[in-house]
Each structure stands twice: as C-alpha cells, then as structure tokens.
Amino acid sequence: MPKTPMTKEEIENTRGRILDTALNIIIEEGFNNLSVRKIASRLGVTATTIYNYYTNKDEINLMIRIRGFEKLYDLLTKHAAPFNDNEKKLKAMVRAYIEFGLTNPSYYDIMFNLHTPKYLDYVGTDIEPLAHTEKQNALKCLHLFIESIGAYIPFKGKKKDHFVLYQVVKFWSDLHGLITLTNSRLFHEVLDDVESFIRQRTSDMIENIIRIKEIF
C-alpha cells in the first residue's frame, strides 16, 4: 500500500524541526561542525531525508536566519501597531527588540553574534539569491528604526540619510551590548539585580535616542 503523502502542515513542521536541530548544533559546536549527516543523526532519519527539504547546510543556515528575522520583524510590528504616536511606537519597538534578544538567545546569537556565513559570503554563488532574500529580511527590521528615528529629522537628502543611519547603528550597538552581556550572564557576575538594571538601562537608552529631536 503506497505511503500517504504528507500534508503541507506536516512538511512545514518537518522543515521546522530540521532548522531547530541545525540551530542547536551551530550553537553547541559552531557552523563549521554542522553537517547534513549530523542533523539527520539527531533526528533519527537518513541524510537523504534532509536533502528532500534542503540542498545543503548553507541553505539551512540562511533559512534559519530568514526565520529569525521574520520572527523579529513580526514582534517589532506587533508591539508598534497599537500606537500612532511616533515616540510611543519607537519605545515599543525598542522593548520588543530587547524582548526578542532575551527570550530567543539562540536565534539572536546566529543573527548577530556567531561567525556564520552571511550575504557577502555568498555573492557569486548559486545560493546568492537566497542570501539576498535573507539580507532584505534583516534590513526590513533596521528600516523600521530608521523610519521612526528619521521622523525627528527635519532636513532631507543624503545628509539626513547618513545622519539617521549613524544614529540608528549607534543605538543598535547599545542595545546589542545590553542583550549580549545579559545572555552571557556577565551582568549576573557584577550586578545584584539584573532585571532592574535592564529596565533602567532600557529607559535611559530610549530617552537618549528621543533627545535627538532637541538638536533641531
């Protein structure tokens, strides 16, 4: 009797399990030690089964990153959606970004910390189109902050673009430091109340970036 074809939901669940398993291997052993055979072994299937869903480990890497940035974008827009006021929207997105980083440490690591191949590493390869898609997903998240912070800047043109990008990346580096030092538990080594520090530091960073409107 022929095997019943998998439903679309079952296929997506299997693809998701493969990505979750690959993510765990990358976090534990590094990207260089990731292999299709190792993923298959952990899932109790053959390597051929994995190849039915993904071409190679580079496609898996990019799909994990795409999935992560989709999760981040959805969270940012969900938190910002209730607000029409730009300042409230910005505050909501900042808190959503921190929430994402602290509650999804494995995804945050592969998206922002680990030395895994990214778009520029795939330029000129067969997988460049997928890498481009991954980069565009990442930039969508960045552009949410560029648009929000840019609303405070009265002038236009390249001068504004450069100024806003600098401010956003500077702010992003502060957020990244907060999340990374929390996830690595280094804050726990020097602070008695990490949660209170995170709340206070978050408020301080938001206040500092909003002050940009006072310059003009």
Regions found by a protein language model. Name each.
Residues M1-N13, F83, K213-F216:
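N-terminal intrinsically disordered/low-complexity leader segments
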Residues I11-A22, I39, I64-L72, L76:
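Generic hydrophobic, amphipathic alpha-helix propensity
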Residues R17, I25-E59, M63:
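Helix-turn-helix
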Residues R67-A92, D126, C141, F145-A151:
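Amphipathic alpha-helical linker/stalk segments
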Residues T77-Y107, K158, V164-F171:
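Hydrophobic alpha-helical connector segments
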Residues K91-D121, L142-I146, W172-G177:
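Helical hydrophobic small-molecule/effector-binding pocket
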Residues Y107, E147, A151, V168-V190, ...:
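Amphipathic C-terminal alpha-helical segment
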Residues K118-F155, L165-V169, S196-I210:
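Amphipathic alpha-helical packing segments from all-alpha helical-bundle domains
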